[in-house]
Amino acid sequence: MAMRAIQQIMLGTVSRTEAEAAETLKRIKNAGYDGIELNGFMIRPTPLIVRYLTKMAGMPVGRGGKFNWKRLVSEAGLSVTGIHTDLGGLEREPENIISEAKKYDTDKLIITGMYRFDYSNKDKVKTLAKRLNDAGKRMKEEGITLCYHNHNAEFLKVDGKRSVMDILIEETEASNLGFEADTYWAAEAGVDTIGFLEKLRGRIKLYHINDRGTKLSKPTFTPLLKSDSMELGYGNMPLERLTEIVLSENVDAVILESHKNWPEKSPLLSMEMSAEFMKKYVR
């Protein structure tokens, strides 16, 4: 059975102190979730630039880098499904990242895309594929599965036909690199989400789930509305079918990541609303 989990990025505004983080994790457990996916930049001291960029994106990470997350997660009765990290850090200090993964009893490390990177440059994308393949081979020696997590940049066409994602799939070995599929970002890029998962069959290790749609609180002046993150089952994505596909792939975890647009600006209320879908379809 796949774990029902939460992405730590949702918790920045409700983990301002260690005591608050403990209460937040207990509430997550009580809502029916089994695990949490951690971010390296949230369990280590967080650089100012990271706090600034995530805040500007509507996802403040807080100052929890000094908290004892190992104890907090364990006391809440949750398991760690994996740790998000960056490729450069993994290449420079593999021993430290490996040690961190083992400390949290997880065998999954996830590369969350590239920053200050030209996704339109085919040669650079091909080099990225090689770097991921090499890093994954190194992690495999330690009993760790390396995964790549997509956003929307990976659906950019780099040669008129193939997308960045196509190259990452085709030019890496399945034994060295798995994928943490995120269909919200595929939908945002205009991609057929079901077709995307079908293309990844055999390599999906983790699944990020989110819904996409529109919330209205008052009449609008025009019929042009902005889509955004939604609680599971409240938007327009074919989540039942998408979940069916990833469960047939025996993913280790289905991980909720609602970025923002939360009811009453509360990520906890949002995750509790999404828990109803998770309990019904992720089992």
List the model feature ranges, each with a label.
Residues S79, H84-G178, L268:
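Active-site acidic/histidine proton-transfer and metal-coordination neighborhood
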Residues L11-T13, I43, T85-G88, Y115-F117, ...:
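Solvent-exposed loop/turn segments at secondary-structure junctions
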Residues V14, E18-A21, K55, M59-G62, ...:
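Flexible, glycine- and charge-enriched loops at secondary-structure boundaries
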Residues G62-W69, R92-I97, R162-D166, D192-T193, ...:
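Alpha-helical scaffolding within the catalytic cores
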Residues E37-N68:
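Glycine-rich, proline-tolerant flexible connector loops at the mouths of alpha/beta enzymes
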Residues M1-D34, G40-M42, R51, M165-A181, ...:
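Histidine-acidic metal/acid-base catalytic patches
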Residues M42-P45, M114-Y119, T214-L216:
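Conserved radical SAM core fold
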